[in-house]
A protein has these predicted regions:
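Short, T/G/N/S-enriched strand-turn elements that build extracellular solenoid repeat scaffolds
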Residues: 55-64, 78-88, 103-105, 111-117, ...
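All-beta strand scaffolds that present successive hydrophobic residues in beta-strands
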Residues: 72, 92-95, 118-124, 146-150, ...
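Predominantly polar beta-repeat domains that present long G/T/S/D/N-rich surfaces used to bind, process
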Residues: 3, 10-11, 228-304
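Right-handed parallel beta-helix/beta-spiral solenoid domain characteristic of secreted/periplasmic
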Residues: 90-139, 150, 156, 180-182, ...
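Residues in short coils/turns that link rungs of repeat/solenoid architectures in beta-rich domains
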Residues: 100, 130, 155, 160, ...
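Solenoidal tandem-repeat scaffolds enriched in leucines and small polar residues
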Residues: 160-220, 224-230, 235
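Right-handed parallel beta-helix/beta-solenoid
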Residues: 2-57, 287-292, 303-304
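Glycine-rich repeat segments that build the extracellular carbohydrate-interaction surface of secreted
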Residues: 30-35, 53-79, 91-98
Length: 304
């Protein structure tokens, strides 16, 4: 049973008490802090005064499905040249801090910055910085039941695709910012392999004004997607299409897109083209291609 030391010399038996973070776990807790003079991946990293130096170094200390938590400390930063392998199931990575003090990860090289191959992993409150060349994605998700929450997925000239989904089911992105900062980005989230079922993307912002538009789609799927939900997302600076799930063709509804707002970066012939829904139901989505004009329903057609 875990023991948490309190300031007056008391001990708390049971789940570790992690300050005011609201995180309870019976697993092990590890700290990562590039700003610490004592940082080393050779440390046990269970004490914030002797943390690991890298995210990947902390992952190597975790036990699968043990409820382990990794805290990336405020101001932590890494330049990643070999993909961070989230290959231990059930690990939760939490970035501490707010604003630009949240942990910042910069990929360099022909890599996916983080490669999630294990199931039930979580990443929260981390900023992924774009690059000038080579990087293929900020996060690749191949493990089922992945959660990404309050992430900043930045795309400069690369990566062309912010997040790739490689056959994972039940992934969930919430309250994330996908941000274009230089010309080049093609897609925010690309579901690139097979039918990823029962996934959710909600309360996210896809903002590509800073990249003079997003070339292909905020969310794109190349295969049929069953049970997907896109909810309450804002798409700003779309060149062509905000959501492209045209490979889903079920007449009975494969999923739903609801409550989304879309701003095209240039005039389009028909705002209906801002969503290519395939077999997805559309409910109360709005789009516009001109400033100072009210957005119209997408699609314009209403049910008979």
């Amino acid at each position: 049973m875990a023991v948490t030391a309190l300031s007056a010399g008391y001990n708390s038996f049971g789940p570790p008490v992690l300050g005011a973070s609201g995180v309870l776990t019976t697993g092990d807790v590890y700290f990562v802090d590039s700003g610490s003079s004592q940082a080393s991946d050779g440390n046990a990293a269970t004490d914030q005064k002797a943390p690991a130096a890298t995210w990947d170094g902390a992952i190597a200390k975790c036990t699968a499905n043990n409820g382990d938590v990794i805290f990336l400390m405020p101001g932590h930063s890494e330049t990643v040249t070999t993909a961070i392998a989230m290959d231990v199931a059930g690990v939760r990575v939490i970035g501490l801090g707010w604003g630009r003090s949240i942990p910042a990860i910069t990929p360099s090289g022909t890599i996916d910055c983080v490669n999630v191959t294990a199931a039930n992993c979580v990443i929260e409150n981390v900023r992924f910085i774009g690059a000038a060349a080579s990087v293929t994605a900020q996060i690749n998700v191949a493990g089922d039941d992945f959660t990404g929450h309050k992430l900043v997925i930045q795309q400069d000239a690369v990566p062309l695709i912010g997040v790739t989904i490689a056959g994972a089911d039940r992934f969930h992105f919430s309250d994330c910012l996908f941000l274009g900062t230089a010309a080049g980005p093609d897609v925010g989230i690309d579901i690139e392999a097979g039918d990823s079922s029962d996934w959710v993307v909600e309360d996210c912002v896809f903002n590509y004004v800073g990249s003079t538009g997003l070339d292909l789609a905020g969310i794109r799927a190349s295969k049929q997607q069953t049970g997907g939900l896109v909810k309450n997302c804002d798409f700003i600076g779309m060149n062509v299409t905000a959501i492209d799930i045209n490979s889903s063709v079920s007449a009975l509804s494969d999923g739903m897109i609801v409550g989304c707002n879309i701003a095209a970066i240039a005039s389009v012939a028909n705002i209906d083209t801002l969503i290519d829904a395939g077999g997805y139901i559309l409910v109360e989505n709005h789009g516009s291609d001109l400033p100072a004009e009210a957005g119209g329903l997408v699609p314009v057609a209403t049910p008979a």
